[in-house]
Amino acid sequence: ELTFNVTGSARNTSLIGNALDRGVGYFGPRKDDLFGLEVVCGSGQIIKTGFRRLGEDSPLAHSHPFGLGPMLDGLFFQGNFGIVTSACFRLMPRRPKEVAVSLALRDSSNLGLFIDELARLKREGLMASVTHIANKARSQASMMFGMTTYLKDFCNFSDTNALIEAEKAVQVVAPNEWTSLGAITGNTGQVAAAIKEIKQRMKKLARVSVITDGLLDVGYAVM
């Protein structure tokens, strides 16, 4: 089963447009995922980059990003040398286990050390995804929409009561001034080992919470 480097954007947004503008997905910059461009130039000429120039029937056309000789792809990222009408996206195997890891900084004065350690976790591959870092206002605002929507749609709360209850809840679950959120992926053993290492490194700096699908299901059931 395959997946690709998605963003958190709405489903109506442009996949190619985001990558051409050097957008970022959950697993890193999306410019690295796009190759084999079909481009209409200002002269009306249609060019295909990489091995797509060999034709769509070639086994190399959609499977390898690098052709022979210089790569033209970079001309069309955040550029106006032509209009990209189609492209290939790099796919990746879906990992058998995925968990979210939330790190809540204990002392705001250690923010610099916190960011440095998060960067090391990413470089060493312990954190598989891009890690979001948010202050309290951002964290609570992000949670409020989901909580109020759930309370209204599934618990029959009025708009006012849903807002009141959600505000109480976010004060409990997101009280810290700075929080990060990232993901760990892999097989069961890899994920367990990564969580153990992250807890060991971060125990003095942050409170570590591991969020699984099962834990979310329990939370929704309780609500």
Regions found by a protein language model. Name each.
Residues L2-E124:
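FAD-binding subdomain of flavoenzyme oxidoreductases
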